[in-house]
Design a protein with these regions (language model features):
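C-terminal extensions of enzymes
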Residues: 67-109
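Shared catalytic-loop signature of beta/alpha-barrel
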Residues: 1-83
Length: 109
């Protein structure tokens, strides 16, 4: 079985659950002995990175360059030695991903 002291769990907070449901999942897991630091957001994108940082989780799945324009992180923010910085802009940081921002802007017109 799964061990809350050894195993890590991944939930796709952006595409399936959203932040509110992700928080509910963390609360339920906590009631069953799991630390939120054993949960790594699935997705490898800017929203998961922000959720991991905002909730002080143990990490974030990362695969830059895949599933573009949604995957990966803000432009000019490279993964170095296993770390990536958050963009210095308000919000999730989608505006700092030029290809994604262009796509979403064109849909909204």
């Amino acid at each position: 079985g799964m061990n809350p002291e050894k195993d890590f769990l991944q939930f796709d907070c952006a595409l399936s659950y959203g932040l509110v449901e992700y928080l509910r999942i963390l609360e339920m897991l906590n009631e069953h002995g799991w630390s939120s630091r054993r949960c790594i957001p699935h997705g490898g994108h800017q929203m998961s990175l922000n959720i991991a940082a905002g909730l002080a989780l143990h990490g974030n799945e990362s695969y830059p360059g895949v599933f573009q324009p949604f995957g990966g992180f803000a432009d000019n923010y490279a993964v170095e030695d296993g770390y990536v910085r958050l963009p210095d802009i308000p919000g999730i940081g989608f505006e700092a991903k030029s290809d994604l921002y262009s796509l979403l802007s064109s849909i909204g017109k």
